[in-house]
Amino acid sequence: KAYPSGMLTDYARTLPSLWCARKSKIAGYDGTSMFENEKSEVTYPNIDVEACWDETGNNINVTTKVEPCMTPDAVNTYAIGYVLTASGLKNDKWLQQADYSAYTSDSYKDAPPEMDFFRNPSNYVDGNYYVKGYTFNHVAIESQGIRYGIANSLTGNFVPNEIKTHTTTFSNINQYNLIQDRNKLEVVAILFDTKNDRIENVAKCRI
């Protein structure tokens, strides 16, 4: 099974982890080549997602549309899962454990732009093992069906040019004090191939 017991159990019990996976696991310090290979894979269905606030401003209504661009194998079954993410999160009290202090040296002057934050010595504390002032993006706030997809979210056979629609709601968003800017919320819709235990396609949108 591709997702037998979750990230925290399998990889890191105490530290945040990132596992970027579709058919293959992408891990290690540099998964660029595997990531590019995953992007080049053709998917059977297209997926599109839209999200909007309801009249109370406290719930997010989500609509996902799935349309086959090729006819999937007859035995394949699919389901949709969702993640609500927040970006732009920052707190002076937050520290992130990082081992990137070597990037402050000229040896890494040609590092990609995303490493610029780690090139500044003033961002390090506690023996250069933690960084402060980091802005966290794409932080998961709430999920639905994140391991296998929501049961019965997509039913029946898939026919080319025939759109299947699924709707859901993220409720009581005001309960999440972690959210700092509602304009930086996104909904990610994940299309699971439940027959072969893999992620087939993904779409995301702003609310």
Residue ranges and their predicted role:
Residues 1-207:
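Short, conserved sequence motifs used for protein processing/export or organelle targeting and
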